[in-house]
Protein backbone atom coordinates (compact mmCIF):
# COMPACT_ATOMS: atom_id res chain seq x y z
CA UNK A 1 0.00 0.00 0.00
CA UNK A 2 1.35 3.41 -0.98
CA UNK A 3 1.10 6.60 1.07
CA UNK A 4 -1.36 8.04 -1.46
CA UNK A 5 -3.61 4.99 -1.22
CA UNK A 6 -3.46 5.18 2.57
CA UNK A 7 -4.48 8.85 2.48
CA UNK A 8 -7.45 8.15 0.19
CA UNK A 9 -8.67 5.27 2.36
CA UNK A 10 -8.24 7.40 5.48
CA UNK A 11 -10.31 10.18 3.90
CA UNK A 12 -13.03 7.66 3.10
CA UNK A 13 -12.88 6.33 6.68
CA UNK A 14 -13.08 9.80 8.21
CA UNK A 15 -15.99 10.83 5.98
CA UNK A 16 -18.10 7.71 6.39
CA UNK A 17 -17.41 6.21 9.82
CA UNK A 18 -19.90 8.35 11.74
CA UNK A 19 -22.39 8.87 8.92
CA UNK A 20 -25.15 6.26 8.41
CA UNK A 21 -23.77 5.24 5.01
CA UNK A 22 -21.55 2.18 5.74
CA UNK A 23 -17.82 2.81 5.81
CA UNK A 24 -17.29 -0.83 4.77
CA UNK A 25 -19.11 -0.36 1.48
CA UNK A 26 -17.14 2.77 0.69
CA UNK A 27 -13.85 1.09 1.53
CA UNK A 28 -14.69 -1.71 -0.93
CA UNK A 29 -15.32 0.81 -3.70
CA UNK A 30 -12.20 2.86 -2.90
CA UNK A 31 -9.96 -0.21 -2.80
CA UNK A 32 -11.47 -1.49 -6.05
CA UNK A 33 -10.96 1.81 -7.88
CA UNK A 34 -7.34 2.10 -6.73
CA UNK A 35 -6.59 -1.57 -7.31
CA UNK A 36 -5.52 -2.13 -3.70
CA UNK A 37 -4.91 -5.82 -3.08
CA UNK A 38 -6.89 -7.13 -0.11
CA UNK A 39 -3.95 -8.40 1.94
CA UNK A 40 -4.06 -9.10 5.67
CA UNK A 41 -2.33 -5.77 6.31
CA UNK A 42 -4.79 -3.81 4.17
CA UNK A 43 -7.70 -5.39 6.04
CA UNK A 44 -6.00 -4.53 9.33
CA UNK A 45 -5.26 -0.99 8.13
CA UNK A 46 -8.92 -0.26 7.38
CA UNK A 47 -9.75 -1.17 10.98
CA UNK A 48 -6.74 0.40 12.70
CA UNK A 49 -7.27 3.85 11.16
CA UNK A 50 -10.50 3.93 13.12
CA UNK A 51 -8.30 5.02 16.02
CA UNK A 52 -7.91 8.41 14.35
CA UNK A 53 -11.68 8.67 14.00
CA UNK A 54 -12.09 7.75 17.68
CA UNK A 55 -9.79 10.61 18.68
CA UNK A 56 -11.97 13.06 16.76
CA UNK A 57 -14.94 12.18 19.00
CA UNK A 58 -12.83 12.55 22.14
CA UNK A 59 -11.57 15.95 21.01
CA UNK A 60 -14.95 17.33 19.94
CA UNK A 61 -16.77 16.07 23.03
CA UNK A 62 -13.92 16.19 25.55
CA UNK A 63 -15.87 18.29 28.08
CA UNK A 64 -18.80 15.87 28.05
CA UNK A 65 -16.84 12.66 27.73
CA UNK A 66 -13.95 12.90 30.15
CA UNK A 67 -14.52 12.44 33.85
CA UNK A 68 -12.06 13.91 36.36
CA UNK A 69 -12.00 13.56 40.16
CA UNK A 70 -13.70 16.39 41.98
CA UNK A 71 -12.04 18.10 44.92
CA UNK A 72 -14.14 18.01 48.13
CA UNK A 73 -14.53 21.80 48.21
CA UNK A 74 -15.82 21.75 44.63
CA UNK A 75 -18.81 19.64 45.66
CA UNK A 76 -20.44 22.67 47.19
CA UNK A 77 -20.08 24.52 43.90
CA UNK A 78 -22.19 22.00 42.03
CA UNK A 79 -19.29 20.26 40.31
CA UNK A 80 -19.97 16.98 42.05
CA UNK A 81 -23.21 16.62 40.12
CA UNK A 82 -21.36 17.24 36.86
CA UNK A 83 -18.78 14.62 37.81
CA UNK A 84 -21.47 12.03 38.56
CA UNK A 85 -23.24 12.85 35.30
CA UNK A 86 -20.10 12.07 33.30
CA UNK A 87 -19.41 8.94 35.31
CA UNK A 88 -23.01 7.86 34.69
CA UNK A 89 -22.34 8.13 30.95
CA UNK A 90 -19.56 5.56 31.25
CA UNK A 91 -21.92 3.06 32.85
CA UNK A 92 -24.46 3.58 30.09
CA UNK A 93 -21.80 3.04 27.44
CA UNK A 94 -20.66 -0.12 29.21
CA UNK A 95 -24.23 -1.45 29.29
CA UNK A 96 -24.70 -0.62 25.61
CA UNK A 97 -21.41 -2.34 24.76
CA UNK A 98 -22.22 -5.66 26.46
CA UNK A 99 -24.45 -7.17 23.72
CA UNK A 100 -21.87 -6.53 20.99
CA UNK A 101 -19.04 -7.99 23.06
CA UNK A 102 -20.95 -11.16 23.88
CA UNK A 103 -22.43 -11.78 20.44
CA UNK A 104 -19.24 -10.73 18.65
CA UNK A 105 -17.25 -13.25 20.68
CA UNK A 106 -19.75 -16.09 20.24
CA UNK A 107 -20.21 -15.61 16.50
CA UNK A 108 -16.79 -14.24 15.49
CA UNK A 109 -16.17 -16.77 12.70
CA UNK A 110 -19.65 -16.35 11.23
CA UNK A 111 -19.32 -12.57 11.33
CA UNK A 112 -15.96 -12.74 9.52
CA UNK A 113 -17.54 -14.85 6.76
CA UNK A 114 -20.42 -12.42 6.36
CA UNK A 115 -18.02 -9.47 6.28
CA UNK A 116 -16.14 -11.20 3.48
CA UNK A 117 -19.22 -11.20 1.23
CA UNK A 118 -19.37 -8.12 -1.00
CA UNK A 119 -22.86 -9.18 -2.08
CA UNK A 120 -24.10 -9.01 1.51
CA UNK A 121 -22.55 -5.57 1.99
CA UNK A 122 -24.06 -4.26 -1.26
CA UNK A 123 -27.57 -5.60 -0.70
CA UNK A 124 -27.71 -4.49 2.95
CA UNK A 125 -26.41 -1.06 1.95
CA UNK A 126 -29.14 -0.78 -0.71
CA UNK A 127 -32.02 -2.06 1.44
CA UNK A 128 -30.85 0.03 4.39
CA UNK A 129 -31.11 3.08 2.15
CA UNK A 130 -34.73 2.28 1.35
CA UNK A 131 -35.47 1.95 5.07
CA UNK A 132 -33.81 5.29 5.80
CA UNK A 133 -36.23 7.06 3.48
CA UNK A 134 -38.93 6.37 6.06
CA UNK A 135 -36.98 6.77 9.31
CA UNK A 136 -38.01 10.40 9.86
CA UNK A 137 -41.71 9.50 9.62
CA UNK A 138 -41.41 6.30 11.64
CA UNK A 139 -39.72 8.05 14.54
CA UNK A 140 -41.09 11.55 14.14
CA UNK A 141 -42.00 11.94 17.81
CA UNK A 142 -39.37 12.14 20.52
CA UNK A 143 -39.61 12.95 24.20
CA UNK A 144 -36.13 14.49 24.14
CA UNK A 145 -35.57 12.80 27.49
CA UNK A 146 -32.26 11.61 28.82
CA UNK A 147 -30.70 8.28 27.92
CA UNK A 148 -31.63 5.82 30.66
CA UNK A 149 -29.91 2.50 31.34
CA UNK A 150 -32.66 0.47 29.61
CA UNK A 151 -32.49 2.77 26.59
CA UNK A 152 -28.71 2.37 26.45
CA UNK A 153 -29.07 -1.42 26.47
CA UNK A 154 -31.62 -1.36 23.63
CA UNK A 155 -29.31 0.87 21.57
CA UNK A 156 -26.58 -1.69 22.23
CA UNK A 157 -28.84 -4.41 20.82
CA UNK A 158 -29.39 -2.31 17.70
CA UNK A 159 -25.61 -2.01 17.35
CA UNK A 160 -25.46 -5.81 17.07
CA UNK A 161 -27.45 -5.58 13.83
CA UNK A 162 -24.44 -3.90 12.24
CA UNK A 163 -22.23 -6.78 13.39
CA UNK A 164 -24.40 -9.41 11.73
CA UNK A 165 -25.32 -7.31 8.69
CA UNK A 166 -22.14 -5.74 7.24
CA UNK A 167 -23.11 -2.79 5.11
CA UNK A 168 -25.86 -1.72 7.51
CA UNK A 169 -23.58 0.83 9.23
CA UNK A 170 -22.93 0.86 12.96
CA UNK A 171 -23.84 4.53 13.00
CA UNK A 172 -27.17 3.93 11.28
CA UNK A 173 -28.09 1.04 13.58
CA UNK A 174 -27.34 2.91 16.81
CA UNK A 175 -28.94 6.19 15.73
CA UNK A 176 -32.10 4.41 14.62
CA UNK A 177 -32.00 2.51 17.92
CA UNK A 178 -31.84 5.81 19.77
CA UNK A 179 -34.75 7.25 17.82
CA UNK A 180 -36.75 4.08 18.40
CA UNK A 181 -36.24 4.83 22.09
CA UNK A 182 -37.74 8.27 21.42
CA UNK A 183 -34.52 10.25 21.63
CA UNK A 184 -34.10 13.35 19.51
CA UNK A 185 -31.99 13.03 16.36
CA UNK A 186 -29.12 14.95 17.94
CA UNK A 187 -29.18 12.97 21.20
CA UNK A 188 -29.31 9.66 19.32
CA UNK A 189 -26.43 10.68 17.04
CA UNK A 190 -24.22 11.91 19.87
CA UNK A 191 -24.75 8.75 21.93
CA UNK A 192 -23.86 6.80 18.78
CA UNK A 193 -20.59 8.76 18.60
CA UNK A 194 -19.83 8.07 22.27
CA UNK A 195 -20.61 4.36 21.90
CA UNK A 196 -18.26 4.22 18.91
CA UNK A 197 -15.30 4.99 21.18
CA UNK A 198 -15.18 1.74 23.20
CA UNK A 199 -16.60 -0.32 20.32
CA UNK A 200 -14.09 0.82 17.71
CA UNK A 201 -11.21 0.98 20.18
CA UNK A 202 -11.81 -2.66 21.06
CA UNK A 203 -11.95 -3.65 17.38
CA UNK A 204 -8.77 -1.67 16.64
CA UNK A 205 -6.80 -3.23 19.50
CA UNK A 206 -8.01 -6.73 18.59
CA UNK A 207 -6.99 -6.28 14.96
CA UNK A 208 -3.60 -4.88 16.02
CA UNK A 209 -3.05 -7.90 18.26
CA UNK A 210 -3.94 -10.34 15.47
CA UNK A 211 -1.61 -8.50 13.09
CA UNK A 212 1.16 -8.69 15.68
CA UNK A 213 0.64 -12.44 16.10
CA UNK A 214 0.79 -12.86 12.34
CA UNK A 215 3.81 -10.73 11.52
CA UNK A 216 5.40 -9.71 14.80
CA UNK A 217 6.61 -6.21 15.65
CA UNK A 218 8.37 -5.96 12.28
CA UNK A 219 5.10 -5.55 10.41
CA UNK A 220 4.35 -2.41 12.44
CA UNK A 221 7.85 -1.03 11.84
CA UNK A 222 7.53 -1.70 8.13
CA UNK A 223 4.18 0.08 7.84
CA UNK A 224 4.57 2.64 10.64
CA UNK A 225 4.48 5.70 8.35
CA UNK A 226 1.41 4.43 6.49
CA UNK A 227 -0.44 3.76 9.76
CA UNK A 228 0.57 7.13 11.22
CA UNK A 229 -0.46 9.12 8.14
CA UNK A 230 -3.71 7.16 7.85
CA UNK A 231 -4.72 7.88 11.43
CA UNK A 232 -3.84 11.58 11.21
CA UNK A 233 -5.87 12.02 8.02
CA UNK A 234 -8.82 10.02 9.42
CA UNK A 235 -8.76 12.19 12.55
CA UNK A 236 -8.84 15.50 10.66
CA UNK A 237 -11.53 14.41 8.19
CA UNK A 238 -13.70 12.84 10.90
CA UNK A 239 -13.66 16.11 12.86
CA UNK A 240 -15.21 17.91 9.92
CA UNK A 241 -17.61 15.06 9.12
CA UNK A 242 -19.06 14.93 12.64
CA UNK A 243 -19.64 18.69 12.75
CA UNK A 244 -21.33 18.57 9.35
CA UNK A 245 -23.45 15.54 10.21
CA UNK A 246 -24.89 16.93 13.45
CA UNK A 247 -25.94 20.17 11.75
CA UNK A 248 -27.34 18.44 8.65
CA UNK A 249 -29.19 15.75 10.61
CA UNK A 250 -30.83 18.26 12.94
CA UNK A 251 -32.13 20.35 10.04
CA UNK A 252 -32.88 17.83 7.29
CA UNK A 253 -33.13 14.34 8.78
CA UNK A 254 -32.14 11.03 7.20
CA UNK A 255 -33.79 11.00 3.77
CA UNK A 256 -30.76 12.32 1.87
CA UNK A 257 -28.60 9.57 3.39
CA UNK A 258 -31.20 7.02 2.30
CA UNK A 259 -30.95 8.10 -1.34
CA UNK A 260 -27.17 8.12 -1.10
CA UNK A 261 -27.08 4.57 0.31
CA UNK A 262 -29.35 3.35 -2.50
CA UNK A 263 -26.99 4.94 -5.03
CA UNK A 264 -23.83 3.41 -3.53
CA UNK A 265 -25.41 0.01 -2.91
CA UNK A 266 -26.77 -0.02 -6.44
CA UNK A 267 -23.33 0.90 -7.79
CA UNK A 268 -21.75 -2.03 -5.96
CA UNK A 269 -24.39 -4.42 -7.30
CA UNK A 270 -23.91 -3.17 -10.87
CA UNK A 271 -20.12 -3.47 -10.59
CA UNK A 272 -20.36 -7.07 -9.42
CA UNK A 273 -22.93 -8.00 -12.07
CA UNK A 274 -20.53 -6.49 -14.62
CA UNK A 275 -17.79 -8.85 -13.49
CA UNK A 276 -15.67 -6.31 -11.64
CA UNK A 277 -13.61 -8.07 -8.98
CA UNK A 278 -14.16 -6.57 -5.54
CA UNK A 279 -12.93 -7.92 -2.22
CA UNK A 280 -13.37 -7.06 1.43
From Swiss-Prot:
Q: Which GO terms describe its biological process?
A: cell wall organization; peptidoglycan biosynthetic process; regulation of cell shape; response to antibiotic
Listed A to Z, the keywords are: Antibiotic resistance, Cell inner membrane, Cell membrane, Cell shape, Cell wall biogenesis/degradation, Hydrolase, Membrane, Peptidoglycan synthesis, Transmembrane, Transmembrane helix
Localization, per the record, is: Cell inner membrane
Disulfide bonds, paired cysteine numbers: none
Q: Per its UniProt entry, what is the enzyme's top EC class, as one word?
A: hydrolase
- What membrane topology does the annotation report for this chain? Multi-pass membrane protein
Q: What is its EC number?
A: 3.6.1.27
Tell whether S-adenosyl-L-methionine is among the UniProt keywords: no
The organism sits in which domain of life? Bacteria
Q: Name one GO cellular component term.
A: plasma membrane
Give the reaction(s) catalysed: di-trans,octa-cis-undecaprenyl diphosphate + H2O = di-trans,octa-cis-undecaprenyl phosphate + phosphate + H(+)
Q: Which residues cross the membrane?
A: 1-21, 41-61, 87-107, 115-135, 147-167, 186-206, 225-245, 260-280
Q: What is its main location?
A: membrane
* MF terms in GO: undecaprenyl-diphosphatase activity
Which Pfam families does this one have?
BacA (PF02673)
**What biological function has been recorded for the protein in this entry?**
Catalyzes the dephosphorylation of undecaprenyl diphosphate (UPP). Confers resistance to bacitracin.
Family to which the UniProt record says this protein belongs = Belongs to the UppP family.
Miscellaneous notes for this chain? Bacitracin is thought to be involved in the inhibition of peptidoglycan synthesis by sequestering undecaprenyl diphosphate, thereby reducing the pool of lipid carrier available.
From the Swiss-Prot or TrEMBL record, give the protein name: Undecaprenyl-diphosphatase
* Species this protein is from: Porphyromonas gingivalis (strain ATCC 33277 / DSM 20709 / CIP 103683 / JCM 12257 / NCTC 11834 / 2561)
Amino acid sequence: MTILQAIVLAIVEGLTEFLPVSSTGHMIIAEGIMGVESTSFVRAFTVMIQFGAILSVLVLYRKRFFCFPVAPRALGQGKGKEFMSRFDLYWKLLIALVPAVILGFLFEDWVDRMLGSVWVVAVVLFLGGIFMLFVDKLFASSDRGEITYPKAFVIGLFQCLAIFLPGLSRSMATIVGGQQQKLSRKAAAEFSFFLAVPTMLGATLLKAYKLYKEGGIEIFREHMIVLLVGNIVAFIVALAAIKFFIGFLTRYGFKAFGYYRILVGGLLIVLMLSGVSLAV
